């Protein structure tokens, strides 16, 4: 072998290795190939250690439902960050934008921690333990009983915890709109923490955790009572106790950036599919129908509010069209698992009209400074949707028929009585 390359006729690798080593390098791959051919002659069951194992826990888990619920959970969190943050941030005056954004961000972090500490246990208790009518048991403080192997139905329990956590995050964030521009950051954190543990978690248990309202047959598929009514009432009470902003009623307080608001509204619309359709806790027809009726109600609420403004002021506004959308979404929330498409159109149109007049009444007649219209949109919408769920769940309304009454109830009157409770 000469310096600078192989001699003519020599193989190229002769420049880098001696012939004995080269023979070994060629022989090793050949031996591996022969061994693999020998293994393939035997059935795989002869080597059980090569077969994938499946635990009893894994057999109880639906991959399809788990995948959908992972997606829905991300969508609901997306509603708060950045959806609701941008929606609210664009509605306030420019000097308060960062304050509102920070409040929504901080609430996401704080509510997540509180849900881990005690919120989930108060709302849902421990698996396999009979729950009381008012509160869940305390066996899941710090999520002590939640493990990787645990399941809730046919999805991992950890995923159910996370999905419900996103609801606990966005509900206090909705209240921010009631006292925006006039509360100290520290006071907001203390109030929100106490409210989540003392109001949200118990009501969540009453409806979804085996409590007294759920046992009565209340139909609240995705949170008309648990989320919208509770948050709206809290926002209204806070607005009354804090009093109006300086200059309210005499100084114009227009939104500072409607582009930001419209962007946030679009995110809310998309995220709401996870909110409502995810509440089916399965990738099935119930989730698909919930998504369809949610979209129809949002569209009809938006058009109805726009039309009311057009009639009253001679032209529609971009703020009106997005607020009507939110009204339609909030109103269909309790009914999204109970009604069909035709009923969803009626619910959306009703939401746009009724919530529009509720907003005018609260601000212009009652002179209540609910900064970002939380009560007339979410509160009135949540109440309206809860009542209409009791009507349109009936299976005897032709094209407007729904999925039926709750167990033990056989008439619209009986279901309405429960819904009104």
Tell me what each language-model feature is.
Residues 5-6, 16, 29-30, 234, ...:
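A ubiquitous, low-specificity "background" feature that marks scattered single residues
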Residues 16-17, 22:
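Cysteine-centered motifs
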Residues 22-58:
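N-terminal secretory/membrane targeting signals
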Residues 5-6, 52, 324:
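Intrinsically disordered/low-complexity terminal segments and short unstructured peptides
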Residues 2-3, 8, 37, 41:
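Basic polycationic patches enriched in arginine
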């Amino acid at each position: 072998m000469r310096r600078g390359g192989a001699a003519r006729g020599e193989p190229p690798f002769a420049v880098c290795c001696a012939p004995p080593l080269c023979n070994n390098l060629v022989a090793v791959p050949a031996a591996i190939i022969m061994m693999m051919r020998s293994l393939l002659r035997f059935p795989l069951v002869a080597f059980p250690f090569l077969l994938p194992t499946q635990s009893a826990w894994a057999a109880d888990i639906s991959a399809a439902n788990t995948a959908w619920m992972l997606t829905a959970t991300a969508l609901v969190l997306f509603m708060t960050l950045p959806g609701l943050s941008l929606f609210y941030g664009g509605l306030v005056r420019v000097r308060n934008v960062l304050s509102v954004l920070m409040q929504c961000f901080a609430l996401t972090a704080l509510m997540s921690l509180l849900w881990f500490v005690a919120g989930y246990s108060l709302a849902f208790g421990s698996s396999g333990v009979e729950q009381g009518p008012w509160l869940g048991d305390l066996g899941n403080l710090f999520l002590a009983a939640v493990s990787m192997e645990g399941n809730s139905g046919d999805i991992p329990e950890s995923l159910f915890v996370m999905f419900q956590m996103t609801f606990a995050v966005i509900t206090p964030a909705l209240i921010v709109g009631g006292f925006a521009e006039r509360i100290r950051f520290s006071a907001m954190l203390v109030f929100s923490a106490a409210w989540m543990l003392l109001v949200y978690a118990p009501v969540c248990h009453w409806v979804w955790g085996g409590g007294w309202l759920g046992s009565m047959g209340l139909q609240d598929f995705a949170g008309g009572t648990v989320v919208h009514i509770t948050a709206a009432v809290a926002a209204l009470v806070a607005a009354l106790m804090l009093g109006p902003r300086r200059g309210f009623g005499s100084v114009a307080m227009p939104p500072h950036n409607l582009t930001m608001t419209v962007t946030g509204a679009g995110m809310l619309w998309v995220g709401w599919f996870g909110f409502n359709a995810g509440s089916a806790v399965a990738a099935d027809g119930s989730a698909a129908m919930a998504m369809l009726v949610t979209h129809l109600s949002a569209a009809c609420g938006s058009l109805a509010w726009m039309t009311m403004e057009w009639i009253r002021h001679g032209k529609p506004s971009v703020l009106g069209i997005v607020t009507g959308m939110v009204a339609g979404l909030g109103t269909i929330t309790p009914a999204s698992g109970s009604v069909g498409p035709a009923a969803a159109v009626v619910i959306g149109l009703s939401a746009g009209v009724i919530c529009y007049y509720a907003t005018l009444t609260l601000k212009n007649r009652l002179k209540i400074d609910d900064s970002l219209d939380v009560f007339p949109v979410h509160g009135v919408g949540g109440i309206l949707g809860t009542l209409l769920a009791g009507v349109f769940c009936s299976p005897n309304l032709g094209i407007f028929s729904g999925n039926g009454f709750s167990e033990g109830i056989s008439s619209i009157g009986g279901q309405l009585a429960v819904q009104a409770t």
